[in-house]
C-alpha cells in the first residue's frame, strides 16, 4: 500500500494509469489461470521425433566432416575458427576476446562464400531444437501430461508478453522441425484446440501509424500485402509477381520495422548490397509515408527522449542523442520499432481480456491457455454447440 501511494500519482502524471489498471492489472489473474491450466503435451510424438532428429543431426555432421576433410568438434568455437578462417581461408568479420567470432550473423555472411557455414547453421538449429525442446519438454510435464509455462509481463521493453520454463513462444513454425515440435502440443480427450491470430498485425499497425495510402489500401482491399509490395517495388502487375519477388517484398516489409540495413537484406536474400539498397529505396518510394513516419518518430524521440504506443505505453530511449554512431543507430531502431511492436502487443493483451470475458459470459467451459505473440490458443470442449459459441 505504501508503494501504491508513491506510484499512483506517478502513473497518473505520466498518463499511464489507465493502461496499468485496465490492461496490466486485469491481465494478471488471467495469466495466472493460464499458467495453472497449462497445455497438454504428447511426449511420445517427441520421443519418436528425437530419433529422426538425431539421424538428421548426424547426416549434417557427416556432410560437414566430408566437406572439410576431417572430423572436429563443431561445438568448439576454437576448432571452428581454425576450420573456417585457417583451413577454409574465409575472412573474419568480427573479433571477440577469445578470437574471431563464429556467431549466427558472421556465419550468415560467410555462407555467401562457402558451403560450410550454412551447414554449421543448420547443425546448430537442429541441435538447439533437440536440447531445448525435444529432449527437455517431456521432463517438464506434470502427472496429467501438461506443461505449465511462466508468463512474464515485465520481460520486454516494448510491452510484449514473454514466457519461460519453458519458453513456448520461441518454437519456430517456419521450418519442418519446428512444426513437428509444435504438433506435440495437443488437446486432451474430449477437447479440441482452437487457434486465432491477427494476420500481419505489426504491418497493420505500421499502416495505421504512418497512414500510408498504398499500405492502407492493400489491407483495406484484402490484398496480399507482400504481393502488393512486390508489384510496386518491381514495377510489375500483381499477377506477374513471382514467389521470389514476394519473398523479397516480405523480407523488406518486416525488415523495415526493425531497421534492416542493405547489408542485412543482402545477406538474408543472397543478393548484392547494391541491389539490396535499390530494393529499400524503391520500397520507400512506394510507401513514402512510412519513410516520413520513421523520420518524424526519430526526430520527436530526439526531442522528448521517449516513444509511445497507441495505448500510451512509454519507452525511454537512452542513446537517441548519442554522439556514438553505433549507439545512436541502435536507439533509432528501438524508437521506430517500439510504437509498432508495442502497440501490437497492447492490442493482443486487450484481445486476451475480451476473449476470456466472452468465453466466461457465454459459459462455454472453453479456456484461453496460451498466447504466442499475435496468436491466442483456446482449449474447448469437443461438441458442436460449444465450438460454434467459442
At which residue positions do the language-model features occur?
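Short, polar/flexible loop-turn hinges at active-site or ligand-entry regions and domain interfaces
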Residues: 7-17, 213-219, 237-241
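Active-site palm subdomain of RNA-directed nucleic acid polymerases
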Residues: 11-23, 27, 347, 351-376
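Extended, hydrophobic alpha-helical segments in both membrane/secreted and soluble proteins
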Residues: 27, 46, 202, 226-229, ...
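Conserved catalytic core of nucleic-acid polymerases
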Residues: 36, 148-149, 153-156, 231-364, ...
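Short aromatic/hydrophobic contact patches that present stacked aromatics
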Residues: 193, 337, 377
Amino acid at each position: 500500500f505504501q508503494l501504491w501511494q508513491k506510484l499512483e500519482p506517478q502513473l497518473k502524471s505520466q498518463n499511464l494509469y489507465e493502461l496499468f489498471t485496465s490492461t496490466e492489472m486485469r491481465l494478471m489473474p488471467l495469466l495466472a489461470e493460464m499458467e495453472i491450466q497449462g497445455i497438454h503435451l504428447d511426449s511420445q510424438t517427441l520421443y519418436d521425433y528425437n530419433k529422426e532428429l538425431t539421424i538428421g543431426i548426424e547426416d549434417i555432421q557427416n556432410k560437414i566432416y566430408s566437406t572439410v576433410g576431417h572430423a572436429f568438434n563443431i561445438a568448439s568455437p576454437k576448432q571452428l575458427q581454425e576450420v573456417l578462417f585457417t583451413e577454409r581461408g574465409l575472412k573474419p568479420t568480427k573479433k571477440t576476446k577469445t578470437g574471431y567470432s563464429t556467431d549466427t550473423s558472421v556465419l550468415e555472411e560467410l555462407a555467401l562464400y562457402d558451403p560450410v557455414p550454412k551447414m554449421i547453421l543448420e547443425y546448430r538449429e537442429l541441435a538447439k531444437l533437440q536440447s531445448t525442446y525435444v529432449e527437455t519438454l517431456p521432463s517438464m510435464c506434470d502427472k496429467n501430461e501438461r506443461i505449465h509455462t511462466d508468463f512474464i509481463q515485465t520481460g520486454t521493453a516494448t510491452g510484449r508478453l514473454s514466457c519461460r520454463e519453458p519458453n513456448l513462444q520461441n518454437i519456430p513454425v517456419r521450418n519442418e522441425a519446428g512444426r513437428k515440435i509444435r504438433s506435440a502440443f495437443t488437446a486432451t480427450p474430449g477437447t479440441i484446440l482452437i487457434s486465432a491470430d491477427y494476420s500481419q498485425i505489426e504491418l497493420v499497425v505500421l499502416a495505421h501509424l504512418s497512414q500510408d495510402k498504398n499500405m492502407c489500401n492493400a489491407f483495406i482491399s484484402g490484398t496480399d500485402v507482400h504481393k502488393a509490395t512486390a508489384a510496386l517495388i518491381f514495377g510489375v502487375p500483381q499477377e506477374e509477381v513471382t514467389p521470389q519477388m514476394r519473398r523479397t517484398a516480405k523480407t523488406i516489409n518486416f525488415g523495415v520495422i526493425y531497421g534492416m540495413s542493405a547489408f542485412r537484406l543482402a545477406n538474408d536474400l543472397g543478393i548484392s548490397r547494391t541491389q539490396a539498397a535499390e530494393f529499400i529505396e524503391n520500397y520507400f518510394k512506394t510507401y513514402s509515408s512510412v519513410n516520413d513516419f520513421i523520420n518524424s518518430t526519430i526526430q520527436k524521440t530526439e526531442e522528448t527522449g521517449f516513444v509511445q504506443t497507441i495505448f500510451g505505453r512509454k519507452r525511454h530511449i537512452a542513446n537517441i542523442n548519442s554522439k556514438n554512431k553505433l549507439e545512436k543507430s541502435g536507439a533509432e531502431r528501438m524508437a521506430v520499432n517500439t510504437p509498432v511492436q508495442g502497440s501490437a502487443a497492447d492490442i493482443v493483451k486487450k484481445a486476451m481480456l475480451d476473449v476470456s470475458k466472452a468465453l466466461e459470459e457465454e459459459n462455454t467451459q472453453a479456456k484461453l491457455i496460451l498466447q504466442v505473440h499475435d496468436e491466442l490458443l483456446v482449449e474447448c470442449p469437443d461438441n458442436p454447440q460449444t465450438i460454434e459459441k467459442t
